[in-house]
């Protein structure tokens, strides 16, 4: 068969082929070689009528198919770009304020830590897990590929701001998707059963009580479908995206003492814009213009008690100092101590920890082995069972993993400890534990757009001073 193709066609084919092969080398996968004959046909032989509609005499067909062709091309391009190179992420909550603000749009690099090969490859581009309007799943559970990460430019570093999949989002009640269903189950079970004093109980006795709480609470959630909706499971890469700061690396021992994070006994530097809650007693309400000047949002101002003339408000060190200087408005500013805020991780252990005084906990590291006891098992059982896929049971005070009695476990993945800079208003690792390496999505590089939810379009909605701010410069 004689192949007739112009020099220009061969050059285009060669460029595309080289790029495609380089991409496969990066992935360390040769499955993509099946695409090469189609590339060859598209540029050289043209046996498959890829653009048959261009020869149609029907103008409607030509018009419609030109749009279909453009949309399909765009979706395929977006699919590959979002999977392997970068994606957009918008800050939905105040957990990282005042480092990252609600309404910041982030350019998130997948290549910084290495992109994951998709675990659910068949999904609709530009959706995370749900199709809008119809509210159905935007992905197919088959095929399901094992976790694999392509080599990136580096690894997660201490104090990096990281985008990751929500670890406790493996099981979700669809009507309350933002809630951690495990914590919700324990809380519901505790409220529905007779109060139990666990102060004098050992670890085995506590476990029996918490197991009962969970069973009762989960049954209640399953029955109250009108309130909670169906309880569904989600694969790792289809879980909600979160963004926090990494304050603990694999193999480190983390402890929070009087609000300060210690790693292996050494205090870690707090973020420049770290926030804590304070009781601000005032002569009169804080004016809107002053609040805006100081970066205090309407959300922050919501907790105002007019009878007591007092705010319960998160402040950075600089904002606290500036507000305290306004003696015409402020009477006093007092610390608000952290508490357990409805149940800290692990939710099935009576630790007595608070958001300001937590731990110590050792962060699991790949290849490291720990001694397991009933006392430390609640801290690590989700790593062993939910994240690394082992069968874990406790019978007669003994620990069984995959049917074998054991008192040790060797971790198969690295784990990280993530926290928000808004320390008293952040659902983070203090509430749901470790972030496994297979949940890491990428690294925010810069803010490409920032919209103030408290302002109108003609009243400073666009935060021009934040545009193209490098996230690495936000310490």
Regions found by a protein language model. Name each.
Residues 1-475:
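Extended hydrophobic leader/signal-anchor segments used for secretion and membrane insertion
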